[in-house]
């Protein structure tokens, strides 16, 4: 989603490829996969981000996701 990052393309690709492999393993429908990814994002926000920053980060993530699907 992000075009500029402090992380290398290799780091991001490795994580994304691992996540795709897990999702494909379960052969679940797209809506279930999106629910699982949404739950994972929510969990990361609530367990790893200070409460004062959660809503702003969730909004930034949402905006980035929307922009990513608009350009494809």
Swiss-Prot record:
Domain of life: Bacteria
Pfam families: DUF1414
SUPFAM superfamilies, A to Z: YejL-like
Family of the protein in this entry: Belongs to the UPF0352 family.
Protein name per UniProt: UPF0352 protein CGSHiGG_07710
């Amino acid at each position: 989603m992000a075009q500029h990052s402090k992380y290398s393309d290799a780091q991001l690709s490795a994580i994304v490829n691992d996540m795709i492999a897990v999702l494909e393993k379960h052969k679940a429908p797209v809506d279930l996969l999106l629910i699982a990814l949404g739950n994972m994002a929510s969990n990361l926000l609530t367990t790893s981000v200070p409460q004062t920053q959660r809503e702003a980060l969730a909004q930034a993530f949402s905006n980035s996701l929307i922009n990513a699907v608009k350009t494809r």
